[in-house]
From Swiss-Prot:
GO terms of biological process kind: D-glucarate catabolic process
Family membership: Belongs to the DapA family.
Gene Ontology molecular function terms on file: 4-hydroxy-tetrahydrodipicolinate synthase activity; 5-dehydro-4-deoxyglucarate dehydratase activity
Lineage of source species: Bacteria, Pseudomonadati, Pseudomonadota, Gammaproteobacteria, Pseudomonadales
Descriptive protein name: Probable 5-dehydro-4-deoxyglucarate dehydratase
EC supergroup of this enzyme: lyase
Length: 303
């Protein structure tokens, strides 16, 4: 798949990031992960991102990363494109990017570098180095310490033909408008805030109709229903699901730092597709929080 073909795929439809399955000992469970992907693939996501933020990229070992990507690519071959999360220090990100390309990933999501503060020029050099190390398409994730300006994104777009996507995890409307205006059709634009459904209608009005859905992991039918309602400007359906599900979900998610991932793993457990616990430093939901989530999910009906 060429970078431009990837850009075309990412320019429409719903995206998602499967959780990564761990066994009781906390090790990667390839068989359970494959079953998860087999279950999710038919629901109609345009692409799935293996080892993304919701997939606990930040806690994955370099030894298990290739197994995760290979399992995803092999399981979804011919059904849905797999993009791989990459990140960390520049050399590590390059190593992961090349491994993912070798294993058949159709593209990469370049997650923010870890902790280290860096200048705009330093972050741009990091992004460029990863892009130049592979031929497949790359999506850069503007979030946390990775805050590229429209001017630098434009320079990167000129120097890196395979940089084809921009994912926004900052939620700064002025910046998003500026990036969209300056780069035009050069990129595919993805909404990437946690529980992106809450912001979906607003981002669509900015010219960003595509977003990644974490809840697709455990309520894929409802996630697709919501996406289609936003696309069709069906404000009745959007409002109903926001009020009945997403806002109550946020009340649970916002109780503790890290729950944006923990609540997804709890959700898949509720529906009978348990992926095991989250890895430290994240913590699982407390029992009362889990029961509140389960009640919300049950109200939505079969998925």
């Amino acid at each position: 798949m060429t970078p431009q073909e990837l850009k075309s795929i990412l320019s429409s439809g719903l995206l998602s990031f499967p959780v990564t399955d761990f066994d009781a000992a906390g090790d990667f469970d390839a068989e359970s992960y494959a079953r998860r992907l087999e279950w999710l693939a038919p629901y109609g996501a345009s692409a799935l991102f293996a080892a993304g933020g919701t997939g606990e990229f930040f806690s994955l070992g370099l030894d298990e990363y290739p197994r995760i990507i290979k399992t995803a690519v092999d399981t979804c071959a011919g059904s849905v494109p797999i993009l791989a999360g990459v990140g960390g220090p520049t050399r590590q990100a390059i190593h992961m990017a090349q491994e993912a390309e070798r294993l058949g990933a159709k593209g990469l999501l370049l997650l923010p570098h870890y902790l280290t503060e860096a200048s705009q020029e330093g972050v741009a050099a990091h992004v460029e180095a990863v892009c130049r190390a592979v031929k497949i398409g790359v999506v850069v994730y503007n979030r946390n310490v990775c805050r590229l300006t429209p001017a630098l994104l434009e320079q990167l777009a000129e120097r890196c033909p395979n940089l084809v996507g921009y994912k926004d995890g900052l939620g700064e409307i002025e910046l998003m408008v500026s990036v969209r205006h300056r780069l035009g059709e050069r990129f595919a634009y993805l909404g990437g805030l946690p529980t992106a459904e809450v912001y979906a209608a607003a981002y669509k009005a900015l010219g960003v109709p595509v977003y990644s859905s974490a809840v697709f992991n455990f309520i894929p039918r409802t996630a697709m229903e919501f996406y289609k309602a936003v696309a069709a400007d069906d404000q009745v359906t959007v409002g109903r699901l926001i009020d009945d599900f997403f806002l109550p979900l946020l009340e649970i998610r916002n109780r503790r730092a890290g729950y944006a991932v923990s609540i997804v793993k709890a959700g898949v457990r509720v529906i009978g597709h348990d992926a095991g616990p989250v890895r430290a430093p994240l913590t699982d939901l407390l029992p009362d929080e889990y029961e509140r989530l389960a009640a919300l999910i049950r109200k939505l009906g079969p998925q």
